[in-house]
């Protein structure tokens, strides 16, 4: 994947403003609420029976932060995303059996969360760079499936 200097700048400058705990929790909660079939991968998280329960669930919050923290590794390693996510791809494919389509869904949700949090800074150019990034990350995570 080739990243222009502008794309790299747009991604890293926005990332510097992201509250990983809050945005990660919101992104995962939205995924579980908007796409309820994804909840089956999180049965050990306890009560996911309603949007209120999901939003207030500390395990959802903690895992959302973990997910977005690992996304930060992509931001730091834009030129080596495939290798950055090799182990996570293996885990999600071989052990967790996560449908790779869920990676794309989470990427789309992350775009919505970023747009909501950074409306003024989330220009069309910024969105284009982030769409490319979430697509590349989703592809890297799905790599072990192919």
UniProtKB/Swiss-Prot annotation:
<dbReference type="GO" id="GO:0031720">
    <property type="term" value="F:haptoglobin binding"/>
</dbReference>
<dbReference type="GO" id="GO:0042744">
    <property type="term" value="P:hydrogen peroxide catabolic process"/>
</dbReference>
<feature type="binding site" description="proximal binding residue">
    <location>
        <position position="92"/>
    </location>
    <ligand>
        <name>heme b</name>
    </ligand>
</feature>
<keyword id="KW-0813">Transport</keyword>
<keyword id="KW-0561">Oxygen transport</keyword>
<protein>
    <recommendedName>
        <fullName>Hemoglobin subunit beta</fullName>
    </recommendedName>
</protein>
<dbReference type="GO" id="GO:0020037">
    <property type="term" value="F:heme binding"/>
</dbReference>
<feature type="domain" description="Globin">
    <location>
        <begin position="2"/>
        <end position="146"/>
    </location>
</feature>
<dbReference type="GO" id="GO:0031838">
    <property type="term" value="C:haptoglobin-hemoglobin complex"/>
</dbReference>
<comment type="function">
    <text>Involved in oxygen transport from the lung to the various peripheral tissues.</text>
</comment>
<dbReference type="GO" id="GO:0019825">
    <property type="term" value="F:oxygen binding"/>
</dbReference>
<dbReference type="GO" id="GO:0046872">
    <property type="term" value="F:metal ion binding"/>
</dbReference>
<keyword id="KW-0349">Heme</keyword>
<dbReference type="Pfam" id="PF00042">
    <property type="entry name" value="Globin"/>
</dbReference>
<dbReference type="InterPro" id="IPR012292">
    <property type="entry name" value="Globin/Proto"/>
</dbReference>
<comment type="similarity">
    <text>Belongs to the globin family.</text>
</comment>
<dbReference type="InterPro" id="IPR000971">
    <property type="entry name" value="Globin"/>
</dbReference>
<keyword id="KW-0479">Metal-binding</keyword>
<dbReference type="GO" id="GO:0005833">
    <property type="term" value="C:hemoglobin complex"/>
</dbReference>
<dbReference type="InterPro" id="IPR009050">
    <property type="entry name" value="Globin-like_sf"/>
</dbReference>
<dbReference type="InterPro" id="IPR050056">
    <property type="entry name" value="Hemoglobin_oxygen_transport"/>
</dbReference>
<dbReference type="GO" id="GO:0043177">
    <property type="term" value="F:organic acid binding"/>
</dbReference>
<comment type="subunit">
    <text>Heterotetramer of two alpha chains and two beta chains.</text>
</comment>
<dbReference type="InterPro" id="IPR002337">
    <property type="entry name" value="Hemoglobin_b"/>
</dbReference>
<feature type="binding site" description="distal binding residue">
    <location>
        <position position="63"/>
    </location>
    <ligand>
        <name>heme b</name>
    </ligand>
</feature>
<dbReference type="GO" id="GO:0072562">
    <property type="term" value="C:blood microparticle"/>
</dbReference>
<dbReference type="GO" id="GO:0005344">
    <property type="term" value="F:oxygen carrier activity"/>
</dbReference>
<keyword id="KW-0408">Iron</keyword>
<dbReference type="GO" id="GO:0004601">
    <property type="term" value="F:peroxidase activity"/>
</dbReference>
């Amino acid at each position: 994947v080739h990243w222009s200097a502008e794309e790299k700048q747009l991604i890293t400058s926005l990332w510097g403003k992201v509250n990983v705990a809050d945005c990660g929790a919101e992104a995962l909660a939205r995924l579980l609420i908007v796409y309820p079939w994804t909840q089956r991968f999180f049965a050990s998280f306890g009560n996911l029976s309603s949007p209120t329960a999901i939003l207030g669930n500390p395990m959802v919050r903690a895992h959302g932060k973990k997910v977005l923290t690992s996304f930060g590794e992509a931001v730091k390693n834009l030129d080596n995303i495939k290798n950055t996510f090799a182990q996570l791809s293996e885990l999600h494919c071989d052990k967790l059996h996560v449908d790779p389509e869920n990676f794309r869904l989470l990427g789309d949700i992350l775009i919505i969360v970023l747009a909501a949090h950074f409306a003024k800074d989330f220009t069309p150019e910024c969105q284009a760079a982030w769409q490319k990034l979430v697509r590349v990350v989703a592809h890297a995570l799905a790599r072990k499936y192919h």
